[in-house]
Design a protein with these regions (language model features):
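Short hydrophobic alpha-helices and adjacent helix-cap/hinge residues
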Residues: 2-8, 12, 20-177
Length: 177
């Protein structure tokens, strides 16, 4: 049996080869680390259940950095989103927030500092082990998630099974599974 390749495919492959595009490196311009973190932050809220079936609407950040600017950029392009970005003067003045993102310099004393129903997220090493809920961890040029399900449960939050399948989970005992 003989396989036939459509003429359109042959012409396309020939055009790519002749123009030199086929010889270009496979790597395309990618996303920056702040853009990836911003995408995680804006999509993370869809995989977490808040107390009383409320829908998360507010992302609070402790400083205006590259990740904050990327979150703002994502939110400004989404027509269907009702998400709001609030840049805090300090963590002591926490307005009603559904998600609080902290950079690695501002995570000290996270345990018990925040209100029930606030998802805490940071990129500091050991954040989830210290009582934070979601930690961004850099692993081999990728951003991995570490989730402390015990801290989430104490705050009345529940991560979806789809989110947990993508993450390293730290239960209440503090050991990874």
């Amino acid at each position: 049996m003989r396989a036939f390749i459509p003429l359109r495919s042959v012409l396309l492959l020939t055009a790519l080869g002749v123009s030199g595009l086929a010889a270009q490196p496979a790597a395309t311009p990618g996303f920056t680390e702040p853009e990836i973190k911003a995408a995680f932050l804006t999509h993370l809220m869809g995989f977490v259940s808040w107390p009383g079936q409320q829908q998360a609407k507010t992302i609070c950040v402790e400083e205006d950095d590259a990740t904050t600017q990327a979150v703002d950029s994502i939110l400004s392009t989404r027509v269907d989103a009702e998400l709001e970005l609030i840049i805090l003067a300090s963590a002591d003045e926490l307005p009603p927030c559904d998600l609080l993102y902290m950079n690695s310099d501002t995570t000290e004393g996270v345990d018990g500092q925040f209100h029930r129903g606030v998802l805490t997220v940071a990129d500091a090493d050991g954040f989830a082990q210290q009582g934070g809920m979601v930690e961004f961890q850099r692993k081999a040029n990728r951003i991995a998630l570490i989730i402390n399900t015990g801290a989430m449960h104490e705050a009345g939050l529940t991560a979806s099974s789809r989110l947990l399948a993508l993450a390293t989970v730290i239960p209440t005992t503090g050991r990874e599974i």
